[in-house]
Amino acid sequence: MDESVIFTTEQNALSTSLYSAEQAVLRQCSTNSRNSAVRVGDKYLFVAQSNKALINVYNISGAHKRETVEQRLPTPEVITCLEVIQNRYEEKSAISDFELPHLLLGSTDGGKIYCWELNSGALLSVKQMAHYQGITKIKSFMDGKYFITSGKDSRVIVWQTIDFVSNNASEPKPICILHDHNLTVNDIAVSMTHGANMSTSGAKLFTASEDSTVRCYDFSFLRGDFRKNRKSQEQDQKMYQPRLLATFTFPAAIEAMSLDPADRALYVGTSEGLFSLPLYYTVKGTSTVANLAQASGSNRNKLYSVVISGHDDDYKKLFSMGQLVCDKLISTPVTKLELTFDATTILVGNKFGRISVVEIASKQILKTLQPLTTADTEEDAITNIIVTTVNNSRQDSILEQHQSNKNVQKLPVLQRVVHDKDHAEHEVWYRAPETPEFSHELESLPPIADFEKYMDSIRSEETVFLTTETTSQVKNVKQELAPASHSNSQEQQELQQELQQVKSAYKELRELHESLFKEHEQLLSSMK
């Protein structure tokens, strides 16, 4: 098991490994906008090019990894952000590494949102003026049912994915709009500990802005059915707004943010360094542990100010004043953050074109990654970091099976005109997955092979259990071990007899010794 790291700068792109020296430079890659690269399945990497209406496709799958561009996909205009909505309903197959996800979302600097179907290349919908200014990030969550966009207009908008793919003639409308920030919202994060439904999920949304604040929202205050109640939603907008739980103020403008998978901590990158904010805050010197992202009964927004830890801090007094003492992991200006699989290390990208692999517990820099180039990269900031786990043995075995197939099918071209969902033909090119070997074994089991027969057998077993008396199946250990115990008793008797003989012999020897000792004393006394 290894972790693959792909990162881009304004002029370069590099694919490397976190635990080895393997490196590959992705050629003809230039992107100056953050969140403009996305991994599509386990095979492809999409990178939106700067100042070009073009998406470069790279093959990054194991032995077939190529440094050159595999394919170029033209787009209607320059794309700044990309996001993939995975097809979570597909069964696992033996060639899952080569399956394509379902939707590709792209945004522009003018605030538009494009939605393509990757298997056909059809442009399903275009949302004009989704934001008043450029979109900085697109984030899908809850298995792609919803996605969130943040923009330079200081707004955060929640969308429902089905509105972009349905045959409804009306254009997609947002579920809710958050406008608590004052400047550009650079990053957003959604907690992974949530339920299946939005209204009862308990999911937390974190937003980071250049106004030096991080805001935490609770999605549980959203209703579950959004499309049927559009009119009532417009009449009572507050009812559909997520609840603002807490606001954290930092000493500098926030550029990037990363949330721990278990919601234990929030890592905030600013122009002055990287801060570690524990969401379960322990007040040193006391037994108090505060859940900073928990809803309070007063329905009031909690305000906290983050300060750097010192030697003589009175944590109890500072916490009573709303100040949180946090550790500063690194002092380099941060542009991009990404946690590793086990969340023990964090990759910190800076504006100098380098990535520092920092161990969170010790605050030590374990490794430094930078592009393999002779050009001056002092002002070549990191724009994208993608970390994925790689099972080398499984990947190599799959690739060997398909090594002889040289006729690789190209990806469908992304359409420039919105697809007519009512009259036009909808052709989808899709590679049918092979059934894995373990699925045949599962199909032979009773519940899957014949469910009705399995339920009949369960009913008959239940009837027998209820009508018959309970019989004990406990073994009588004493009865079974009776012959063995009898033989053991004979051995014990023999040993006891031998022991008695030894005791009697010892007693005789002792008496003889005592008599001889008395005679010896008498002899000594007579000689005196």
Curated annotation (Swiss-Prot):
The keyword rRNA processing applies. One of its GO terms (cellular component) is rixosome complex. Keywords: Nucleus, Repeat, Ribosome biogenesis, rRNA processing, WD repeat. InterPro entries: WD40/YVTN_repeat-like_dom_sf (IPR015943), WD40_repeat_dom_sf (IPR036322), WD40_rpt (IPR001680), WDR18/Ipi3/RID3 (IPR045227). It comes from the Eukaryota. GO terms for biological process: pre-replicative complex assembly involved in nuclear cell cycle DNA replication; regulation of DNA-templated DNA replication initiation; ribosomal large subunit assembly; rRNA processing. It is found in: Nucleus. One of its GO terms (molecular function) is chromatin binding. WD repeats lie at residues 79-126, 130-169, 188-227, 249-290. Component of the RIX1 complex required for processing of ITS2 sequences from 35S pre-rRNA. Component of the RIX1 complex, composed of IPI1, RIX1/IPI2 and IPI3 in a 1:2:2 stoichiometry. The complex interacts (via RIX1) with MDN1 (via its hexameric AAA ATPase ring) and the pre-60S ribosome particles. Belongs to the WD repeat IPI3/WDR18 family. This is Pre-rRNA-processing protein IPI3. It comes from Candida glabrata (strain ATCC 2001 / BCRC 20586 / JCM 3761 / NBRC 0622 / NRRL Y-65 / CBS 138).
